[in-house]
Amino acid sequence: MYKIGVLPLNGFALMSYASLVEPFRAANFLSEKKYYKVINFSESKEGTVSSSGFKILGDHYIGDTPELDIFFVIAGGDPFKYNNKNLYHWINKLAQNGVTIGGVSGGPIILVKAGLMKEHRMTVHWEHSPSLLEIANEIILEKSLYVIDRNRITCAGGTAPIDMVLAIVKKQQGTKFAQLVSDWFLHNEIRPSGGPQRSNLVNRVGTTNKFALSAIELMENHLADPLTLNQLAELNTVSKRQLNRIFKKYFDKGTMEYYRELRLDKAKNLLRNSSLSIAEISHMTGFYSSSHFSSLFMNYFDLPPTQYRNSDQISYINRIR
């Protein structure tokens, strides 16, 4: 029997938790054998509360030593603020004892903070990637659904754990059985580990115009060091006037207004999902000063950045992560 430990941290998303544990349960049900045993952990006897208010009680607690093959940490909210040295010490001890260590959604950040991802490839939910690279630029970060690198497993969260668990089941029980488990969840196609976390640019922006798509891709790759309108036009081999006409036609706004809103949306994500300072966020999104950034943010969102960060609007409701 393969024993899987799961530690959700307060603010975790039920979607990530269910996508991780349910395929193991289904594998047992469909095989009529006990291939897998999921063991829930919590930090205290009070249990762990999800972003939607659902509580999970632990079978074991941090520091316990039941026999395990894999141990997963699931984190939501702001994992950058989390700092439990007892947990870091304990999961390092598990790793030293041969347990494969995994992280889901914001969980990979916990593994980085515990010093467990050195010289290992990894992934994390796309909203956390910029902030993670700011604090740990030495990591090997990929934009994948999940990464299995020797004795480390990281997963972006959402529904991606289904594909990750199916990869584990496939390796142990074969392709045919893994597909049977996948079909049980109406999950017709098992996605590869390197599959994209987000829909492609065409679907996200709603146009197939090649000049608009090329310009937006350049914008997304130059948030901290914004390009000028002249540079965007030259790189797309169109005139500034033509590029502005394209953006007016498809987005009802000028090129640079679109670019500024893109940077402000990224700043909003960082305010919601990181503990970076206002100055750091303004720098990461290409605004020359905190005051300039705050003024633009206020005009666009009707709230100053500090008030937005502290408001009830963003209180650990982590959508589907």
Which stretches of residues belong to each language-model region?
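N-terminal beta1-alpha1 cap of cysteine-dependent amidohydrolase-like domains
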Residues: 2-63
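…primarily DNA-binding HTH/wHTH and HhH modules…
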Residues: 273, 277, 291-321
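Flexible gly/pro-rich beta->alpha loop and the following alpha-helix that scaffold active-site loops
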Residues: 39-101
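Short, Lys/Arg-enriched, Trp-marked, Pro/Gly-tolerant hinge/linker segments that flank
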Residues: 146-155, 172-217, 221, 235, ...
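A conserved active-site-flanking secondary-structure segment within enzyme catalytic domains
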Residues: 117-145, 180-181
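Basic/polar phosphate-binding segments, predominantly the helix-turn-helix DNA-binding elements
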Residues: 218-220, 229-262, 282-307
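Catalytic nucleophile loop
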Residues: 90-127
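Basic, amphipathic alpha-helical hairpins
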Residues: 170-174, 211-228, 247, 268-277, ...
